[in-house]
C-alpha cells in the first residue's frame, strides 16, 4: 500500500513538472501561457540589450509585442517592477534599412502584426515611453542607454 502511494506521488510530481505551469521560465521571470518575460534595469544601448537577451534564456530576445493583450501584460510588468527614472524601455522592434524603404521587424524575426507606434524622429530602434505608461512605442536613437524587457519561449 505504501509503495503504491509513493509511486502515485512520484507520477504526480512528474506530471506537474511537465505540464507547463510556468516552471519552464528561468527563476524570477514572469510568464503568460506561452512566454517568459523579465525587465532588466541595466542601462544598455539597443544592440547591447538585444545581445544580452539572447544570453539570458534559450530563444531569448528583446520583447516582441504581438497583441493588445500582450502590450498590456508588458506595460503592467514594467510598471510593477520599475526601479529607474528612465523615460524609455527598449523593445525588440527596429527598422531594417533596405533600399528604397524601411522594414520594421522584431528581433525574434517575426513581422509586425500589432502596432502601437508614434514615429516622432527618424530613428531605427523602438522603446516604450514612461509618459504613456509604457503602452506606446516611440522610435529612438539606438545608441542611447535604457532599461529593457527580454522575452523567451516558456
From Swiss-Prot:
Instruction: Classify the source by domain of life.
Output: Eukaryota
Record keyword Transmembrane present: no
Q: Which residues form the signal peptide?
A: 1-23
Q: Which UniProt keywords apply?
A: Disulfide bond, Glycoprotein, Secreted, Signal
Annotated GO CC locations: extracellular region
Chain ranges of the C-type lectin domain: 32-151
Please give the coiled-coil regions recorded for this protein. none
Compartment(s): Secreted
Q: Which Pfam families match?
A: Lectin_C
Q: In which tissues is it expressed?
A: Expressed by the venom gland.
Which PANTHER family did the record assign?
MANNOSE, PHOSPHOLIPASE, LECTIN RECEPTOR RELATED
- Assembly and binders: Heterodimer with the alpha subunit (AC W5XDM0); disulfide-linked.
What the record says about family reads:
Belongs to the snaclec family.
Please report the name of this protein according to its UniProt entry: Snaclec lebecin subunit beta
Per the UniProt entry, what species is this protein from, by scientific name? Answer: Macrovipera lebetinus
Amino acid at each position: 500500500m505504501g509503495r503504491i502511494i509513493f509511486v502515485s506521488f512520484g507520477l504526480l510530481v512528474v506530471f506537474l513538472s511537465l505540464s507547463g505551469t510556468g516552471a519552464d521560465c528561468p527563476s524570477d521571470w514572469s510568464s503568460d501561457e506561452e512566454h517568459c518575460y523579465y525587465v532588466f534595469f541595466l542601462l544598455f544601448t539597443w544592440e547591447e540589450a538585444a545581445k544580452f537577451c539572447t544570453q539570458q534564456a534559450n530563444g531569448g530576445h528583446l520583447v516582441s509585442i504581438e497583441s493588445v493583450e500582450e502590450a498590456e501584460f508588458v506595460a503592467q510588468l514594467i510598471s510593477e517592477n520599475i526601479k529607474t527614472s528612465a523615460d524609455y524601455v527598449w523593445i525588440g522592434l527596429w527598422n531594417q534599412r533596405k533600399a528604397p524603404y524601411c522594414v520594421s521587424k522584431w528581433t525574434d524575426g517575426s513581422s509586425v502584426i500589432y502596432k502601437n507606434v508614434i514615429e516622432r524622429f527618424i530613428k531605427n530602434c523602438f522603446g516604450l515611453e514612461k509618459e504613456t505608461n509604457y503602452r506606446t512605442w516611440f522610435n529612438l536613437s539606438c545608441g542611447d542607454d535604457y532599461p529593457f524587457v527580454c522575452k523567451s519561449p516558456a
